[in-house]
């Protein structure tokens, strides 16, 4: 299903589909999330577009989690381009901090929304992204008290110049963890 949060479908990147049924179902969601400071450094025309895009993304994510509940899914997979700055409040590169907004943090609201949705969701959440070109798999989100959100996993795929490696994601309904993450090395042909 494509997002219909606006009359002219200004955000065709926002898609959703479901694989499976009942407790084995997984809901897949894509959102329009550009890198480079969430598109805020892209010139006046694109910068004016950002509030509407960010609102559409938030609405679309809320709808996706509501849909996941309605179909009794076990997991939600969210795919986007940008690394939404998980490191800013995860403690991955320093001490764990309570998340707080700073003027230069273009992704703060998205991370808070993801933490809210994940903590209210009984299943697993997998966030897939690229952007910073290095493999990462961790649980970077923190709740409002600074505690890890344990059912939220982020996987960042390899990017240039690491073009000989890839990531395999296995989905195992009825098992814990629901998502298996395996790094792979391409074999020379």
PLM regions and their residue ranges:
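Extended active-site neighborhood of metal-dependent phosphoesterases/phosphodiesterases
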Residues: 1-56, 60, 137, 141-172
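His/acidic metal-ligating clusters that form di-metal
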Residues: 27-29, 44-141
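Short, surface-exposed linear patches
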Residues: 43-44, 99-100, 106, 148-152, ...
């Amino acid at each position: 299903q494509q997002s219909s949060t606006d009359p002219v479908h200004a955000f065709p990147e926002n898609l959703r589909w479901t694989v499976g049924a009942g407790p084995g179902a997984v809901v897949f969601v894509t959102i329009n999330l550009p890198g480079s400071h969430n598109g805020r450094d892209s010139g006046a025309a694109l910068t004016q577009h950002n509030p509407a895009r960010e609102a559409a993304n938030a609405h679309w994510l809320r709808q996706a989690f509501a849909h996941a509940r309605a179909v009794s899914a076990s997991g939600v997979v969210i795919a986007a381009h940008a690394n939404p700055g998980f490191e800013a409040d995860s403690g991955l590169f320093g001490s764990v901090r309570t998340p707080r907004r700073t003027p230069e943090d273009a992704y703060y609201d998205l991370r808070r929304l993801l933490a809210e949705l994940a903590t209210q969701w009984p299943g697993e959440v997998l966030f897939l992204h690229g952007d910073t070109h290095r493999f990462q798999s961790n649980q970077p989100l923190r709740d409002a008290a600074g505690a890890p959100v344990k059912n939220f996993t982020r996987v960042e795929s390899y990017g240039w110049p690491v073009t000989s490696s890839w990531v395999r994601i296995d989905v195992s309904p009825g098992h814990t963890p629901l998502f298996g993450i395996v790094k792979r090395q391409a074999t020379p042909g």
